[in-house]
């Protein structure tokens, strides 16, 4: 059985593809060590209403503008939490309307992967991982089997296509990330977003 990719001397392997790209949100870039690495999967977890969706929508809009300037693929924002109209309204409020920011409302994994195939994004945002379900797996969205399957499929897409993926994740009442604990070990980075939903400041 021949390997899919031949082994090469390490000095001949370009490290450029593994360099972090700034998100345009300074504090998030600081936490991530300079930005998002192509092919990396980042989980942003926090309580409902803390501002996870707004933060990632801002990141998506800034990334879309940067991708357009670099003649790269668009940014695909998939919402399973809200309607496309609700997300568009929030984008207007934060000045996040950009022609390279594509929006899709999907809750089925196959349809989500079809959107990725059709659009060829340079960044994928999924809000949230607990709202997506695979028709091939028993159980409802957010269950252990579903979250594991959905996360696994999205991680595979990130690695195969070399695109960063940002996932929104909810936390339980005791502060733990909802879904199987394995989710935290599957992704490359886990960011905890905290704060009072009525306050102006948030902690990442």
Task: Report each predicted region and the residues it spans.
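Residue-level signature of catalytic and energy-coupling elements of molecular machines
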Residues: 31, 44, 87, 127, ...
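Conserved inter-motif catalytic segment of the P-loop NTP-binding fold
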Residues: 39, 47-50, 54-156
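Detector for small/aliphatic-rich hydrophobic stretches
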Residues: 1-42, 54, 61-64, 70, ...
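Conserved P-loop NTPase
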Residues: 1-10, 117-121, 130, 189, ...
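Short flexible coil/turn linkers enriched for glycine and charged/polar residues
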Residues: 38, 81, 196-200
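Phosphate-binding/switch region of NTP-binding enzymes
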Residues: 148-204
């Amino acid at each position: 059985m021949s390997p899919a990719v031949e082994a090469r001397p390490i000095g001949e392997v370009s490290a450029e593809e593994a360099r972090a790209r700034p998100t345009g949100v300074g504090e998030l870039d600081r936490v991530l060590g300079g930005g998002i690495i192509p092919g990396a999967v980042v989980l942003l977890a926090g309580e409902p209403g803390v501002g996870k969706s707004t933060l990632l929508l801002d990141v998506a809009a800034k990334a879309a503008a940067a991708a357009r300037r670099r003649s790269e693929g668009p940014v695909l924002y998939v919402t399973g939490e809200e309607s496309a109209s609700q997300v568009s309204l929030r984008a207007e409020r934060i000045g996040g309307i950009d022609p390279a920011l594509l929006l899709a409302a999907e809750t089925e994994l196959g349809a989500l992967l079809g959107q990725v195939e059709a659009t060829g994004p340079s960044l994928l945002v999924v809000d949230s991982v607990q709202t997506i379900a695979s028709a091939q797996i028993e159980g409802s969205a957010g269950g252990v089997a579903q979250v594991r399957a959905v996360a696994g499929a999205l991680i595979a897409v990130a690695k195969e296509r070399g695109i960063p993926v940002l996932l929104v994740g909810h936390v339980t009442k005791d502060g733990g990330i909802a879904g199987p604990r394995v989710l935290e070990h599957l992704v490359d980075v886990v960011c905890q977003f905290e704060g009072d939903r009525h306050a102006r400041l948030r902690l990442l």
